[in-house]
């Protein structure tokens, strides 16, 4: 490893250390500084955009939805609260909410056409959690969507209250790919909850602006 003498001190290039030790060092033009990736082998190049996962297969999305339901029920079990049943109509409604947000970029409990979120069903006894997660964040953190979602919701008092509300008996989950306000690819994620003793007989189509 070549050292350089400057003003009586010896210096070694950071990229040479990266090569020798086995971590990546690269110049990040966006931030205007050198970046270090301790968990990646040396290439001298910034990570490519291919690090962001491609569109998930339907089976993967279905598995993520089931995982979200399971993780939510695990939180309830820890508190001695009855599990939520995955309701087909509520699952459809949650997917409509995720789809309409992804299609319009409207990240809100208000639907793209200005109506309240619960108008996606014919029952007002419905609660909603929403989240927007960039794909790049999941790739950088190396965490699964379901794990990240439920953990994030559990750290928010209002979202956690919905997930552990004893008056809710059923759950629906919707996931859709879209872009956020900055143009970054992201997941639009929805949980819908239905109070005990109520049912849904109709689900609306996705709303537009």
Each model region followed by its residue ranges:
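Primary recognition of N-terminal secretory signal peptides and signal-anchoring hydrophobic helices
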Residues: 1-56
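Second-shell loop/turn segments in exported
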Residues: 2-7, 52-63, 77-87, 129-143, ...
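Extracytoplasmic/secreted proteins, especially bacterial periplasmic and envelope-associated proteins
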Residues: 12-16, 63, 67-74, 85, ...
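Sec-exported extracytoplasmic/periplasmic mature domains
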Residues: 19-23, 73-81, 95-106, 135, ...
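Short, well-ordered surface patches within globular domains
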Residues: 60-119, 166-172, 176-178
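A well-ordered secondary-structure block
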Residues: 116-198
């Amino acid at each position: 490893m070549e050292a350089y003498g400057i003003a009586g001190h010896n210096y070694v290039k950071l990229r040479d250390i990266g090569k020798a030790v086995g971590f990546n060092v690269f110049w990040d033009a966006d931030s205007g500084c050198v970046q270090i990736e301790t968990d990646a082998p040396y290439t001298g190049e910034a990570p490519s955009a291919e690090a962001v996962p491609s569109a998930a297969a339907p089976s993967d999305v279905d598995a993520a939805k089931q995982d979200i339901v399971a993780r939510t029920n695990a939180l309830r079990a820890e508190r001695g609260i009855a599990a939520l049943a995955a309701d087909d109509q509520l699952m459809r409604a949650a997917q409509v909410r995720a789809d309409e947000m992804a299609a319009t970029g409207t990240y809100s409990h208000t639907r793209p056409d200005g109506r309240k979120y619960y108008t996606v069903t014919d029952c007002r006894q419905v609660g909603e959690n929403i989240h927007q997660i960039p794909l790049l964040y999941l790739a950088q953190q190396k965490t699964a969507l379901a794990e990240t979602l439920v953990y994030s919701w559990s750290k928010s008092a209002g979202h956690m209250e919905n997930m552990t509300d004893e008056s809710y008996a059923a759950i629906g989950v919707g996931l859709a790919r879209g872009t956020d306000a900055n143009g970054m690819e992201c997941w639009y994620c929805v949980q819908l909850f239905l109070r005990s003793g109520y049912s849904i007989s109709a689900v609306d189509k996705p709303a537009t602006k």
